[in-house]
């Protein structure tokens, strides 16, 4: 079905060949994903010929046994992959003048190798925007996987909360989360590097976990996600370890109110900028606008950051079936940071989150 869309696009745009280079996009079109490391793993589609998946011999049998029911062409390490690709293309079609390439995943070295095989071809057409657009709208089968990934994120939060104790390092908490995800849920891949930030470290939104230790009476920020059958989760919660100060409670409640207001306001037909503005106004009116230093959200699907960008100034119209995050944050340098994030799907009835961990301020007991 997805590959039919690609072939139709080639025909409508006068293109002969599509060169798909990102493993994630190949998975979207074929149902097969692997990590080829430094080897060549590509999908070739044509306006009027059968597509083929090109992969290392190491992955050939796996690809043949996958959901992909088209041709698979493997190559040995002793072979030149680019000359073999050219041979396969010329077997299938005489039309290879006009190429559409996924520029987001095309390296200079690979472009040069292709151009050497097809010196008279035009590689200037970019597939990236088309791919981003068709991936915007999730099918029900995709939503099932996104919801499952959300359930895994909810489980991970509970493990992380339980792991907090006096003197434990941020990295040790991350290790416990990821170990229990593997042990109890069979999760073999997180969607990004798990973030646990305690105290003033939480004021640096994307700082990785450190050897900083958790201390009583501070906020701890968790940002985590998993991959479930090729689909990502991404969620954030902030908790108090021990009794928070009044200022900590204040910034938490302002942020929670802003996030819930944006969730309640989200509907088809509004722009991404308008949705960002809902949360941003609440935080600004409370006096913390300068500490909300990023966009409200981002799309999610097979990758943890996709289109659309829920950002001030982005006038893309939100539509039913789009999946994205709503994640306002307040980060006060040298003091603390708060972020609350849910990813979900926009329906005719509003925004439906994939994660359900409570957003009331959780005050965890101090443990030795």
UniProtKB/Swiss-Prot annotation:
Pfam families: Creatinase_N, Peptidase_M24
Reaction(s) this enzyme catalyzes, per UniProt: Xaa-L-Pro dipeptide + H2O = an L-alpha-amino acid + L-proline
CDD domains in the cross-refs: APP-like
The protein's required cofactors: Mn(2+)
Single Gene Ontology BP annotation: proteolysis
UniProt keyword Transcription regulation present: no
MF annotations from Gene Ontology: metal ion binding; metallopeptidase activity; proline dipeptidase activity
Entry GO CC: cytoplasm
Binding, Mn(2+) 2: 223, 234, 341
SUPFAM superfamilies: Creatinase/aminopeptidase, Creatinase/prolidase N-terminal domain
EC supergroup of this enzyme: hydrolase
Binding sites annotated in the UniProt record for Mn(2+) 1: 234, 298, 327, 341
The keyword Heme belongs to this UniProt entry's keyword annotation: no
Similarity remark: Belongs to the peptidase M24B family.
This protein's name: Xaa-Pro dipeptidase
Organism: Lactobacillus delbrueckii subsp. lactis
């Amino acid at each position: 079905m997805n590959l039919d869309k690609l072939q139709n696009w080639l025909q409508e745009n006068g293109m002969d060949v599509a060169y798909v280079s990102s493993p994630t996009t190949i998975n979207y079109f074929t149902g097969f994903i692997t990590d080829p490391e430094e080897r060549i793993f590509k999908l070739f589609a044509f306006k009027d010929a059968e597509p083929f998946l090109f992969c290392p011999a190491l992955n050939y049998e796996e690809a043949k046994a996958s959901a992909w029911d088209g041709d698979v062409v493997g190559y040995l390490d002793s072979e030149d992959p680019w000359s073999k690709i050219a041979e396969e293309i010329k077997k299938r079609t005489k039309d290879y003048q006009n190429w559409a390439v996924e520029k987001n995943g095309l390296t200079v070295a690979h472009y040069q190798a292709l151009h050497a095989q097809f010196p008279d071809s035009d590689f200037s057409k970019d597939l990236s925007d088309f791919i981003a657009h068709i991936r915007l709208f999730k099918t029900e089968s995709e939503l099932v996987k996104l919801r499952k990934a959300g359930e895994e994120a909810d489980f991970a939060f509970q493990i992380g909360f339980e792991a907090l104790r006096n003197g434990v390092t941020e990295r040790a908490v991350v290790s416990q989360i990821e170990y229990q995800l593997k042990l109890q849920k069979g999760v073999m891949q997180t969607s990004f590097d798990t973030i646990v930030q305690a105290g003033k470290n939480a004021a640096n939104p994307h700082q990785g976990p450190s050897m900083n230790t958790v201390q009583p009476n501070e906020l701890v920020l968790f940002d985590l996600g998993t991959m479930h059958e090729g689909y990502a989760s991404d969620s954030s919660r902030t908790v108090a370890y021990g009794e928070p100060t009044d200022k900590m409670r204040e910034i938490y409640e302002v942020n929670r109110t802003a996030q819930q207001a944006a969730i309640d306001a989200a509907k088809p037909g509004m722009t991404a900028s308008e949705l960002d503005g809902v949360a941003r106004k609440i935080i600004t009116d409370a006096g913390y606008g300068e500490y909300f230093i990023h966009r409200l959200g981002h799309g999610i699907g097979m990758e943890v950051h996709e289109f659309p960008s829920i950002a001030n100034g982005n006038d893309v119209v939100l539509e039913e079936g789009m999946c994205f995050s709503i994640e306002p944050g307040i980060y006060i340098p040298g003091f603390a940071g708060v972020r609350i994030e849910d990813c979900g799907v926009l329906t005719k009835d509003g925004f439906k989150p994939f994660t359900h961990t409570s957003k009331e301020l959780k005050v965890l007991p101090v443990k030795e």
